[in-house]
Amino acid sequence: MIELKKIKTGDAEYAQVEHLFGTAFPPEERRSREDQRRVTDENPFFITYALNQEGAFVGFVTCWQGPDFVYVEHFATVPEVRGKGIGSEVLGLLAQQYTVPLVLEEIGRAHV
């Protein structure tokens, strides 16, 4: 089972989030490290979740929470767990957590 844990840059998992962020997304699809840290710590509408499975870090999700929807901005898992249904499980957990619709942007496989 996956656990969603809200984190900030001072939390232990954040270094793993930063590393995966840098390997899972090209530079043009992410903020600078400094800007990402700032929005994570200072913007009350921006949420970073570490994804843990049996106590091990397996990925992260970043979201913008608005009054009418939650926008899932970045979502990545470590290579070892890809294709094992974690993405569906995480989206289900997010849908249970929020009373407003989730909005996702899908990028084609050519970019993965």
Regions found by a protein language model. Name each.
Residues 24-54:
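Active-site rim helix/loop that mediates acceptor-substrate recognition in acyltransferases
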Residues 77, 83-96:
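Conserved acetyl-CoA-binding loop-helix of GNAT-fold acetyltransferases
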Residues 2, 46, 100-101:
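A structural micro-motif
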Residues 1-35:
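Short amphipathic alpha-helix that is part of the acyltransferase structural core
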Residues 97-111:
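Conserved GNAT acetyl-CoA-binding A-motif
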Residues 50, 55-65, 69-76:
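Conserved beta-strand in the GNAT
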